[in-house]
Amino acid sequence: MANCEGTERGDGDEDANRAGGWFLVEAIVEQTTGYQESSDEDENSEDRGEDLVDFIDTRSLGDGQEVPLDLFVQQNARDDAATVQALKRKYTCSPASSSCVSLVDSELSPRLDAISINRGHDRARRRLFDQDSGYGHTQVDIGAPESQVSGGTQHTKGGGGAVQEAEEERVGGDGEAQCSAQTQQTPERAADVLEIFKVSNLRVTLLHKFKELFGLAYGDLVRQFKSDKSICGDWVVCAFGVYHAVAEAVKTLIQPICLYAHIQIQTCQWGMVILMLVRYKCGKSRETVAHSMSTLLNIPEKQMLIEPPKIRSGPCALYWYRTAMGNGSEVYGETPEWIVRQTVVGHAMQETQFSLSTLVQWAYDNDITDESELAYDYAMLGNEDPNAAAFLASNCQAKYIKDAITMCKHYKRAEQARMSMTQWIAHRGRKVADSGDLREIVKYLRYQRVEFVTFMGALKLFLKGVPKKSCMVFYGPSDTGKSLFCMSLLKYLGGAVISYVNSGSHFWLSPLVDAKVGLLDDATYQCWQYIDTYLRTVLDGNAISIDRKHRNLTQLKCPPLMITTNINPLEDQAFKYLHSRIVLFKFMHKCPLKSNGDPVYTLNNENWKSFFQRSWARIEGPDEQEEEEDEDGSTSRPFRCVPGEIARPL
């Protein structure tokens, strides 16, 4: 075998000295013509071995050099996925937020999931209330964790900050998504207060949380006002999400604007919750209270429940009374009377039963004969008069009102029947506070060309009810003031009006039964025919029989009657039998008016009072007047229908 160039094969000892003969000696390569030697192959250059330092990696695996880079890549991937998921929240739900059933189906049978024609998208339902972890009632705030998972969406805290996203849909399935608030978690608060205020039905959420904190429903303490403009002096305010410093300061800040304040403070994961019963110095509406409390507590108006309290509820009053005695409440001012009345034993024992005679006496003293007016006016005394309060607490208010008006009418009818016309005029005059000027009446009579002496003589016989002289007729064209003159006199004397339009009824004359003076306004030709046929006795002033509804026929002396008409019955021979029964006065001139439409001559109760006081001697005589009323006023005892207190022996 030929020897290879550059290789020596030894034998014997020479082979032993040469590592057994298998080691190959370095080959010698000759350089070709034109070859340029590089700096790396320069044999003469000094080699220090620096280029071979990292030629072989001798480091052990697991030193953690690649771990930060790998984690950074994973973290960026998660952040990118979360950002994309947040942008897609208004559209079809992504697989990351799809239901658990869809994920399980796609993972167990991917081939079946791939060939499905229409994927059913389950509508995401937002929880109305988050599950409480049990740490919500502590006053110490706990820092937020680094990573939170809520509703299938992951909240991570990266190197650049914290990103929160929440995918919500309105309750009721309308398909509209609400924008989620992105807030930064802070270690000072255990949970974000604004999370609860993103729901669509905020009031239901607040009512539920109120019941959890205070142990009873908010509706048990309040009555609802539908209008925000309704005025009330007492208000129940429950504010959520109040800062701790503000909650402590409100006990002092609210004192200048209210007369009474009952404040309770509770804590939850949303922050401080304040329940207040406030009595303001003046009545306020819900809008005013909301604006005032929003400024005072530094919270939005939507975070408050504002309604008036139940002032007639015993359990409600007892709740405020018992909680005010505990150390968990701050109370300022005097306790409202509706709480004291329903809780304190002394006030409860002082409550008396309703007395009908007291109601009748009150209606008689105030000259009330209308049921609606009596019910309204007496109900307004519920906070002042104990009998009125017992009346409001009764279930027979309508019956009491009807009975009281009936008795009041009986008393007044009997009182009127016992008085003569002179006494009645004096009685009506005492009801008028001021005294006017009788010259207004005299000037008006002169303006209508009516002799004052003739009128006074006819009025004297008219008021006395002299037969054939107890009917005064005022004749003239329209707009001459006939009705104005007669109506003003009738109002002062407290008379009654009858209308010919009701002549078809048997009871159209029944108002004359309870009146001292009557008036038939604007009698037409047909009315005069009816009077000439059926009412000649009425014009005479003699006793007549009047039919009343649900009553027997009543026989009485007909009161004096005034008639206004545009027809002169004295000129018509068809009414010749009425000529001797009436006294006629002509008003031929139109009533003058001021620029504002008021009459130039004022005919009111004050002027009629002055008229009768100054001309009393011509009508009745001075002796009877002096007996009726002396210088110190009326000497008659006032009517009393309530039982007095009788002194009984011990």
Swiss-Prot record:
Q: Where is this region: DNA-binding region?
A: 185-351
Query: Which of the residues bear the PTM Phosphoserine?
Result: S94, S98, S109
Q: Where is this region: Disordered?
A: 134-184, 620-650
Q: Where is the composition biased (Acidic residues)?
A: 622-633
Q: Does the keyword Nucleotide-binding apply?
A: yes
Q: Which GO terms describe its cellular component?
A: host cell nucleus
Which Gene3D superfamilies does this entry report, sorted A to Z?
A: 3.40.1310.10, P-loop containing nucleotide triphosphate hydrolases (3.40.50.300), Zinc finger, large T-antigen D1 domain (1.10.10.510)
What is its biological role? ATP-dependent DNA 3'-5' helicase required for initiation of viral DNA replication. It forms a complex with the viral E2 protein. The E1-E2 complex binds to the replication origin which contains binding sites for both proteins. During the initial step, a dimer of E1 interacts with a dimer of protein E2 leading to a complex that binds the viral origin of replication with high specificity. Then, a second dimer of E1 displaces the E2 dimer in an ATP-dependent manner to form the E1 tetramer.
Q: What is this protein called?
A: Replication protein E1
The record lists the organism as: Human papillomavirus 72
